[in-house]
Amino acid sequence: MQPGSETTVVVNLDYHSTGEDSQPVRIVASLNDWTIDRDGQVQFARANTMPNSASPWLIYSPAETTVTPGNVHAIRVTISVPKDATPGDHLTALIVEQRPDNLKLNQNRRQVVIRYRMAAVFYIKVPQLRRVGSLESLRAEATAEQVVVTPLLKNAGNSVIRPLTSLKVTDSAGVSVAELPQKESLPLLGGAELAQPVVLETRLAPGTYTVKYRIDFQDGSRPTEGITELVVPQRTSGGPANRGPVAASNE
């Protein structure tokens, strides 16, 4: 969205319930900031407390309503981008949750009470977007039943990247012993790092292996391949295997 522009979108709540005991529920909406941390976990915080928060740009209605089973309920969200908005992604989330006073306990019967929070996340993109992905390091280790590979990814740009990644482990003869086909990894936010382990459910015999991690950041650059050595010793205590230094190359 351009600085100074405005648009309205609709978030639909579909209360899909077929149980005989389904009842209308009172819900309340609010805004949170959000991010994805270095470990790949989505984190939420109070509105307008995180860098690049878009929470002040949103107005929504209704803030509170009653939803009934079998119906779709709309929340209208108006986004107004300030004229002085900086380039890049600005993030916010519309949170919908059940009102606490809607949770009624019956002291004469056993009950399981579930409270929920749902989030519709927003990426508001202000032009002059940059996506600059890099593979900073690569670590690999073997446990009794798994190979765990941990790449450290970095986005030096100001807009989210959705990398495509694949993984292959070969033995000393160059024969593939385990691999993962290409798939989309977690989003890598602008200015962020991500170190999320990739797990292969396989048991490796003692020996020396080569781990190849290939990544296409889809940022206009060529795919990158990180290579590291994995040494699986004879195990006596079930500890992890050694891992060698990383080598990365652009193809």
Tell what function each PLM region has.
Residues 4-10, 73-75, 86-93, 145-149:
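Short, solvent-exposed loop/turn segments enriched in Ser/Thr/Gly
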Residues 10-14, 78, 148-156, 199:
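Short edge beta-strand/loop segments characteristic of extracellular beta-sandwich folds
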Residues 2-3, 65-73, 185-194, 220-222, ...:
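Short proline/glycine- and polar residue-rich coil/turn motifs
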Residues 1-23, 64, 133-146:
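Beta-sheet-dominated interaction scaffolds and their linkers
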Residues 66, 80-86, 201-205, 218:
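Short, surface-exposed loop/turn segments at beta-strand-coil junctions that are enriched for proline
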Residues 90, 94, 207-215:
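A short tyrosine-centered beta-strand micro-motif
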Residues 16-21, 35, 83, 100, ...:
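Short, acidic/polar linear motifs in exposed loop/turn regions
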Residues 17-77, 164-167, 171-177:
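Surface-exposed binding patches on compact interaction domains or structured appendages
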